[in-house]
Amino acid sequence: MIVDAYNQFIRGYIVDPSKNPNGSPIGGIRTFINIFNKLTREIKPDLLVLVWDGKGGSKKRRSMNKSYKGGRKPPRTNWSQVGMVEEEITDNKVWQQMRVIEYFNQTPVIQFMEPLVEADDVISYVKNNPMFAEWQKVIVSADKDFIQLLDDKTILHRPIQKEYLNKNNVVEKFGIHPSNFALARAIVGDSSDNLPGVPRVGMETVAKRFSFLKEEQTYYLEHIIAECEKPENKQKVFSSIKENKELIKNNYDIMQLSSPMLSIQAKQGIDNTFEEYQPHYNQTEVRKLMLQDGVLTVTTTDLEQRFNNIITSFSQ
């Protein structure tokens, strides 16, 4: 199980106004543990991987497009009643996130946070690691960007949407095969990342006008342009796509995860982590941290059972 960690952490941070006895918000910690406990109960993974966005986000993508993720507003919480100014709320969010990382460093969970690298790239690299070629992989994230990674051995669980996506039901739902999903998204754009697409062209239009994208074969921008240039295709959508060819290319270069934007050193570090992995579980330290933070009442039964199972399986 490969978890887009910040994507899940921010859910709890936003909605849970819980405070510890010292008056500090701890909703992010509480809810993340609850979510992780539920995930392990449902999925029963043999290996647990948490991947966090590195500090500073993707330097490579920003160098390709200075507007990438520009204009994003800080996440809005529903716990303004805690009486903290914006700077204090930001500091608390960082503290809660680092505290979660500290918790799971005491467990068999493998964690990654590469500086100036997005979690997406690390998740793609982990998913494609030859060590796990025969493993069934479950990526956990609400982010549609990961649909492009789905194959016979990889599915996507979107907890907020309460759905599991595989390469077959993605075609049924969107009319686009995962192998062509990044291309389709490049045409449509992604407002959440401040990447505009071709005007007035959505996923349904792409699926309808380029029906070959539902095939497992991987198609590229030149195939889209060739379709647009057919004499019988006179609708506005085709000319708009031709006019925005460069925009689509730039979007695709940023959105694609088939070639994750990781340095050789980062890739080697990830490989070494897996090769040297020796699962451990310091339950005493975890309980100590939970007591300090006022979250000792949070249920961790399924997590603890899974931790012990992982340790047992790797010791055999």
Where are these regions (language model features)?
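Non-catalytic nucleic-acid-binding/docking modules located in mid-to-C-terminal regions
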Residues: K38-W52, S67-P74, S80, T107-I110, ...
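Noncatalytic, basic helical substrate-engagement surface that gates or grips nucleic-acid strands
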Residues: M1-V138, F146-Y164, Q256, M261-E275
